[in-house]
Amino acid sequence: RGFFYQCTGEDDLSKLLDKEKINGYIGFDCTAESLHVGSLLQIMCLRLLQRHGHRPIVLLGGGTTRIGDPSGKDKTRTILSEEEIEKNIKNIEKILKNFLDIKDPKTKPIFVNNYSWLKNLNYISFLINIGKHFTINKMLSFDSVKTRLEREQSLSYMEFNYMILQAYDFLELNKKENCVLQMGGSD
């Protein structure tokens, strides 16, 4: 009760969860060696999904960490080195394995790093095939963008595109891992 802030298609999701076992994911940026207490809610969502017989997918944002999530930030993040990001990914994966059941073959979590599909994206092709589905109007309505603009704080083009990369993550996970559920923060 009160665990979720909002849900798109809640009735359809309930029916789907009752009817079949699904794969659902949450993404974690790897900007630090460890997770913070704010990540506990997301971890508990993955555990809850798993305890009900579904398979959690943990997306470790090796690619998106290189850009930096603008949510809740008033300035552009410092770009981490590839070595720092890889170290953080290993540490965070180790932490998450303490919370999730890694032994049950039916619900064993899938760990993926979005750098594997983001590193070789062809920019022109990406804009033509993916970018056409996003409107600036909608992107300007997100809290992370509105807040920065209202405070007259800069928001780089790189950060502005972060949400498109998140959507692309879901597309890739749907194709590669049959993922049908995305969970995460409100923005």
Language-model features: where?
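NTP-dependent nucleotidyl-transfer catalytic core
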Residues: 1-186
